[in-house]
Curated annotation (Swiss-Prot):
Belongs to the intron maturase 2 family. MatK subfamily. GO terms for cellular component: chloroplast. InterPro entries: Domain_X (IPR024937), Maturase_MatK (IPR002866), Maturase_MatK_N (IPR024942). This is Maturase K. GO terms for biological process: mRNA processing; RNA splicing; tRNA processing. One of its GO terms (molecular function) is RNA binding. Usually encoded in the trnK tRNA gene intron. Probably assists in splicing its own and other chloroplast group II introns. It is found in: Plastid, Chloroplast. Keywords: Chloroplast, mRNA processing, Plastid, RNA-binding, tRNA processing. Pfam families: Intron_maturas2, MatK_N. PANTHER family: MATURASE K.
Length: 506
C-alpha cells in the first residue's frame, strides 16, 4: 500500500491531466482486476475468467482515447439497438473492463485521502466486530433510547451528467470529466443502475462498480445535511452517520443553501438529543429519541430540502415512520433483522429485603432464515422447503473447485450473521450447503452420497466449511463534537452486491 501511495501522489499543478497518466499504468489495471485496494480474498469476485485480460483493456482504452482525440467523438455503428458497437468492439463486453478501470481511477484520490488521514494513527480493531449483525448490537448503548425510526427510500437515480459533474468537482480535472462523460453516455445500462420496486429502489446485480461509486457520491451530498445540522443546532448533541464519502466543499455549499433558502427559521423544531442515520442499498433509516410529531417534521423538512436544493422530487409518502417498540428495524436487507425488546433486570439489596427493578431496552439480532432459504432455492442449492439439491452446473468442475465454491458461499453468509446470538438458522444453512456439495460431488463421480462420504470422510467437507478468512475493515476517523477525540465507524462489505448474488433476495 505504501508503494501505491508513493506512486500515486499527484501534483496540484498537474491535476488537469488526472486520468491519462494513471490509466496507462499496469498496477491500475491490476487493481481493477482485483476489484479494490488491498482487498482480502473474501472480498474478491470469483467470476472473473480469461476474458478479463488486462492487456485487452489497456489496448482498448488507448484505441478509444486516440479516436476521441482524432475525431472528437466516438464512432458508433448501430446495426441493432441491442448490438451497438464502439469502434468495432462489442459494448457489453468491453464496457465492463473500461468502467472497472475508471472506477479504480476515480477512487484513488479518496483512498489517498484516507491513507493520509490515518497516517501516524493506530487503528484499533475490535475483535468482537466480526459481522454486520454485530454492528446493531454494538450500537445498543447509543440507539437503545431511540423511540421512532423513519425509513426513507432514496430518491430516483441521478442523471449521468449530474453524477459525472459531482465527481469532476472533487477530482478538479476537466479532461477526466470529459472522458468519463463520453463513456457514461455511450453506456446503455445506466438506467438499470437501480431497479424500482413498490416502496424502494434496489441495486441491480449487474451494476458496475463505477456507477455504484457515482451514485453513492451523489446521494451523500443531500444526506450529509445531518452533519451540518449537528454543528448548527445545540440540540443535536449526538449523531451517528455511516456515509460512503464526504464532500470537500460540503459545509460551504450547505451553509449557503440553508441560510439563503430560509431553512434556518425551522431548525428550532429539531430538539431530539439523539439522532442516528444509516443508508444501505437505496434505503435510509433515521432513528431518533422523540415523538412521531418530531419525525414528521424531519420527514417534511428533508423532502423540502431535496426539492429546493437538489431539484429532486420526492413524495412524503415514500418515507415511513415506525415505532421501534412495535416494528423490527431491518435496514440491511438480508444482512440482519434487529428487534428492540424490553429487558427487566432486578437487583436485591444484601441488608435490606426489597428488590429494585431496572428496565432496559436491548437489541436482538435475528437471522432471516426464510428469505435466505428462498435465495438458496433460486441459486439451485435446495428447494423452497430447505431440502438440499445437487448443483448440476458445477458437476464438471474439479473436486477442490466444487468444495471451494460451496464453502465460499457459506463463509460469505456466515460473515454477516455470525454476530447474531441465535445461530440455529446458520446451522441449517450450513447443512443445506454441505449436503448440496456432497450430492454434487456424488453426481460427478456417479456414486451415492453415503458411498462418497464413506470413501473420502466427512471431515473433508468440514475443513472447507470452517476455514477462517481475513476480513478487510474500512475505518473512517471523524472528529467528535464534544471532546475533539477521534471515534471510528466501521463499514462492512461495500461491494456485497458485486460479489454475492444471494444478497439481492428481495
Amino acid at each position: 500500500m505504501e508503494e501505491f501511495k508513493r506512486d500515486l501522489e499527484l501534483d496540484r499543478s498537474q491535476q488537469h491531466d488526472f486520468i491519462y497518466p494513471l490509466i496507462f499504468q499496469e498496477y491500475i489495471y491490476a487493481l481493477a482486476h482485483d476489484r479494490g485496494l488491498n482487498r482480502s480474498i473474501v472480498l474478491e469476485n470469483p467470476g472473473y475468467d480469461n476474458k478479463s485480460s488486462l492487456l485487452i483493456v489497456k489496448r482498448l482504452i488507448i484505441h478509444l482515447i486516440t479516436q476521441m482525440y482524432q475525431q472528437n467523438h466516438f464512432l458508433f455503428s448501430a446495426n441493432d439497438s441491442n448490438k451497438k458497437k464502439i469502434v468495432g468492439y462489442n459494448t457489453n463486453f468491453y464496457s465492463q473492463m473500461i468502467f472497472x478501470g475508471f472506477a479504480v481511477v476515480v477512487e484513488i484520490p479518496f483512498s489517498l485521502x484516507l491513507l493520509s488521514s490515518l497516517e501516524g494513527k493506530e487503528i484499533v480493531k475490535s475483535q468482537n466486530f466480526q459481522s454486520x449483525x454485530x454492528x446493531x448490537x454494538x450500537x445498543x448503548x447509543x440507539x437503545x433510547x431511540x423511540x421512532x425510526x423513519x425509513x426513507x427510500x432514496x430518491x430516483x437515480x441521478x442523471x449521468x451528467x449530474x453524477x459525472x459533474x459531482x465527481x469532476x468537482x472533487x477530482x478538479x480535472x476537466x479532461x477526466x470529466x470529459x472522458x468519463l462523460r463520453f463513456f457514461l453516455h455511450a453506456y446503455h445500462n445506466w438506467n438499470s443502475l437501480m431497479t424500482q420496486k413498490k416502496s424502494s429502489f434496489s441495486f441491480s446485480k449487474k451494476n458496475k462498480r463505477l456507477f455504484l461509486f457515482l451514485y453513492n457520491f451523489h446521494v451523500c451530498e443531500y444526506e450529509s445535511i445531518f452533519v451540518f445540522l449537528r454543528n448548527q443546532s445545540s440540540h443535536l448533541r449526538s449523531i451517528s452517520s455511516e456515509t460512503f464519502l464526504e464532500r470537500i466543499y460540503f459545509y460551504r455549499k450547505i451553509e449557503l443553501x440553508v441560510f439563503t433558502k430560509d431553512f434556518k427559521a425551522i431548525l428550532w423544531v429539531f430538539k431530539x438529543p439523539f439522532l442516528h442515520y444509516v443508508r444501505y442499498q437505496g434505503k435510509s433509516t433515521l432513528a431518533s429519541k422523540g415523538t412521531s410529531l418530531l419525525m414528521n417534521k424531519w420527514k417534511y423538512y428533508l423532502v423540502k430540502f431535496w426539492q429546493c436544493y437538489f431539484y429532486m422530487w420526492s413524495q412524503p409518502r415514500r418515507i415511513h415512520i415506525n415505532q421501534l417498540s412495535n416494528d423490527s428495524l431491518d435496514f440491511l436487507g438480508y444482512l440482519s433483522s434487529v428487534r428492540l425488546n424490553p429487558l427487566m433486570v432486578r437487583s436485591q439489596m444484601l441488608k435490606n429485603a426489597f428488590l429494585i427493578g431496572n428496565a432496559f431496552x436491548k437489541f436482538d439480532t435475528l437471522v432471516p432464515i426464510i428469505p435466505m432459504i428462498g435465495s438458496l432455492s433460486k441459486a439451485k442449492f435446495g428447494n423452497v422447503l430447505g431440502h438440499p439439491m445437487n448443483x448440476s452446473v458445477w458437476a464438471d468442475l474439479s473436486n477442490p473447485d466444487i468444495m471451494d465454491r460451496f464453502x465460499r458461499x457459506f463463509r460469505n453468509l456466515s460473515h454477516y450473521h455470525s454476530g447474531s446470538l441465535k445461530k440455529m438458522s446458520l446451522y441449517r444453512v450450513k447443512y443445506i450447503l454441505r449436503l448440496s456439495c456432497a450430492r454434487t460431488l456424488a453426481r460427478k463421480h456417479k456414486s451415492t452420497v453415503r458411498a462418497f462420504l464413506k470413501r473420502l470422510g466427512v471431515g473433508l467437507l468440514e475443513e472447507f466449511f470452517t476455514e477462517e478468512e481475513q476480513v478487510f475493515y474500512l475505518t473512517f476517523p471523524k472528529a467528535s463534537s464534544s471532546s475533539g477525540e477521534l471515534y471510528r465507524r466501521r463499514i462492512w462489505y461495500l461491494d456485497i452486491i458485486c460479489i454475492n448474488e444471494l444478497a439481492n433476495h428481495s
